[in-house]
């Protein structure tokens, strides 16, 4: 895969997106598969240098090109003439002379060139086509996705005799359909209903409008009462579609206050570093907050902002009231026990002293951690170098030492949750976590969300059966990833998914979204916070449906109306803006396909929103009791 330039097999203008582990459109309803799945299929084909290989579904030609660098000869069949001609031209330009391409029905194989030592099918069939099995040589391997488009399994069929075959299941996958006489017809729903019709969209908007429960302001007492239906849950996850919108913070604060005051919720956990949140928690509970101000690192505006500081001030007063009436306090936690933001800051500072060029690579890679990006728009600047790899051991040592110091501080500060057993567990897994984080990618996301889910579980266990927790995190964390491109295209999971799987009946997932407005975000990781204008949501997106419902603010209960739920099951684009916003590449950088009514239990809508108000850090390095935590 290092030899074949993948960027030569994508459409013009998409070169910078070539190396993200995600599929990319190449036209005619086809995609170039993500590098991981291409590598997996080739690996499972057990290719040898003298093999003759058939690929069904040439597409861009990338897989055939890879196979041609391993095997003696490749035969490739493509249904679309334009793609076949394009692939042939690419092979000629690159000097790959051992590939033959023809236009035809891939489900019938290539009988004249048979038998084959291996056949790789780059499209999903309802069942294994007989013709392909018959064109295998004795001992030949057929790699093919089989099943309906939402339940495909990757199979390896090995010919063991004249009429006998062995079959292995290699796991779940998602491919475009194989069209042909022995496969799907051209009327396959992936082609006929990929984009919802205008009539369907109009119907869905009307259903949203009818089901929408409007509110005038999150400050009205009637607003928080709307969420009483979720108060029986033990875990309530409150999302946001950006990390820089005032209304999202104000909404989560209003719901949290109501649940704390009236329904016994006593834990708040947020998408933040544990040490910073621990300083807030100590201050909320009358303890010395420690040296320094929390949330001083990028992206500091996420928690160092006026809207959140008001909620912190309310929790402080609430705990004072509780102390006076001999009630247990509200506790505040960060879900990132491994101190992700602090660790990244430590990595960048270290790399800056060793090699500024390597530090630039690290910044780009940390900017690509978001799962909704079709590809980091900066791949070329984020490619791994030997210098980057050479810093790995030193970085791991530095991050682990930082974690150990944090745990020591917790012990000296009498942090009852992070006891000796919990600290030992964290340190034992630290090296793996920091190594994965250093290189980024889907594995880093999965590891982080799994640890956050573990933290939620440990908090509930520690605080006892009466404990109830509210979680503040991005929609990409609190939504159920199984019903998004995160799972189908990148094999990623989410905190919301894991909470549902572990605590199904007592978990509520509530997303938040907007059509347009202002947002605080940076251009790149570690960049300057800026007030940016959001583009209006894209046509045929979930957000555009809500916008066309023509109501400025509302709650949408996705469980209450069967017709609404069914209408919003269909996959549509949904926008996700993190700490980085790149409006010029909006579609590729900030949208992915989701099933809204399966992803969340409810959705809170603001048609137009405003940027939150970042607070500048005070000059003093000590926590002043009168101005802590944000010095205003």
Question: Where are each of the predicted segments found?
Answer:
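Generic recognition of short, well-ordered alpha-helical segments
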Residues: 36, 114, 131, 247-251, ...
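General small-molecule cofactor/ligand-binding pocket signal
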Residues: 100-102, 168, 333, 510
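Short, well-ordered secondary-structure micro-motifs
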Residues: 12, 111-114, 131, 155, ...
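Conserved nucleotide-cofactor-binding alpha/beta core module
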Residues: 46-162
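Short, well-ordered strand-loop elements centered on a beta-strand within folded domains, enriched
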Residues: 154-156, 162-171, 329-334, 613
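Class I SAM-dependent transferase core
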Residues: 2-70, 83-100, 161-183, 187
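Generic structural signal for secondary-structure transition and capping sites
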Residues: 6-9, 141, 175, 235, ...
């Amino acid at each position: 895969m290092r030899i074949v330039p993948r960027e030569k097999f994508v459409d013009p203008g998409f070169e910078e997106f070539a190396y993200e582990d995600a599929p990319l459109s190449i036209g005619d309803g086809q995609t170039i598969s993500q590098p991981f799945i291409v590598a997996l299929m080739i690996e499972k084909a057990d290719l040898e240098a003298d093999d003759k290989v058939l690929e069904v579904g040439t597409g861009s030609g990338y897989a055939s090109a890879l196979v041609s660098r391993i095997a003696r000869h490749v035969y490739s069949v493509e249904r679309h003439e334009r793609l076949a001609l394009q692939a042939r031209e690419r092979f000629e330009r690159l000097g790959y002379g051992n590939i033959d391409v023809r236009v035809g029905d891939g489900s019938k194989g290539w009988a004249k060139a048979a038998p084959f030592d291996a056949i790789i099918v780059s499209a999903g069939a309802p069942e294994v086509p007989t013709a392909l099995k018959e064109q295998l040589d004795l001992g030949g391997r057929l790699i093919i996705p089989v099943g309906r488009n939402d339940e495909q399994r990757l199979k390896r069929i090995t010919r063991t005799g004249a009429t006998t075959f062995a079959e292995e299941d290699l796991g779940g996958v998602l491919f475009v359909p194989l069209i042909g006489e022995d496969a799907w017809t051209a009327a396959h729903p992936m082609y006929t209903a990929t984009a919802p019709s205008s009539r369907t969209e109009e119907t869905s908007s009307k259903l949203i409008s009818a089901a929408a429960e409007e509110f005038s302001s999150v400050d009205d007492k009637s607003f928080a009462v709307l969420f009483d239906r979720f108060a029986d849950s033990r875990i309530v996850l409150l999302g946001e579609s950006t990390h820089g919108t005032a209304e999202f913070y104000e909404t989560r604060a209003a719901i949290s206050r109501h649940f704390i005051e009236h329904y016994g919720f006593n834990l708040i956990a947020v998408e933040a570093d544990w040490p910073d949140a621990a300083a807030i928690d100590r201050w909320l509970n009358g303890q010395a907050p420690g040296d320094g101000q929390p949330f001083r690192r990028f992206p500091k505006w996420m928690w160092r902002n006026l809207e959140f500081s008001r909620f912190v001030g309310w929790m402080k007063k609430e705990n004072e009231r509780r102390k006076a009436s001999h009630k247990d306090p509200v506790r505040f936690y960060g879900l990132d026990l491994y101190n992700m933001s602090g660790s990244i800051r430590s990595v960048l500072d270290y790399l800056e002293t060793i090699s500024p060029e390597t530090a630039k690579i690290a910044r780009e890679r940390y900017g690509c951690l978001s799962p909704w990006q079709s590809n980091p728009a900066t791949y070329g600047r984020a490619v791994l170098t030997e210098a980057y790899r050479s810093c790995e051991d030193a970085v791991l040592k530095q991050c682990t030492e930082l974690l150990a110091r944090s745990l020591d501080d917790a012990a000296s500060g009498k942090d009852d949750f992070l006891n000796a057993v919990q600290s030992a567990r964290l340190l034992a897994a630290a090296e793996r976590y920091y190594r994965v984080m250093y290189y980024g990618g889907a594995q880093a996301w999965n590891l982080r969300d799994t640890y956050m889910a573990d933290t939620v579980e440990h908090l509930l266990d520690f605080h006892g059966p009466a404990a109830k927790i509210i979680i503040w995190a991005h929609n990409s964390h609190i939504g159920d990833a199984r019903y998004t491109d995160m799972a189908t295209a990148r094999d990623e999971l989410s905190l919301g998914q894991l909470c549902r799987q572990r605590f199904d009946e007592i978990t509520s997932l509530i997303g938040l979204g907007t059509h347009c407005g202002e947002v605080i975000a940076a251009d790149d990781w570690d960049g300057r916070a800026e007030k940016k204008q959001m583009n209006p949501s894209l046509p045929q997106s979930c957000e555009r449906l809500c916008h066309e419902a023509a109501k400025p603010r509302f709650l949408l209960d996705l469980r209450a109306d069967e017709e609404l739920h069914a209408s919003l099951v269909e996959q549509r684009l949904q926008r996700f803006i993190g700490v980085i916003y790149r409006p010029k590449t909006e579609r590729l950088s900030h949208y992915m396909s989701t099933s809204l009514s399966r992803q969340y239990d409810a959705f809170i809508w603001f048609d137009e929103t405003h940027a939150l108000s970042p607070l500048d850090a005070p000059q003093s390095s000590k926590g002043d009791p009168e101005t802590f935590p944000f010095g205003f």
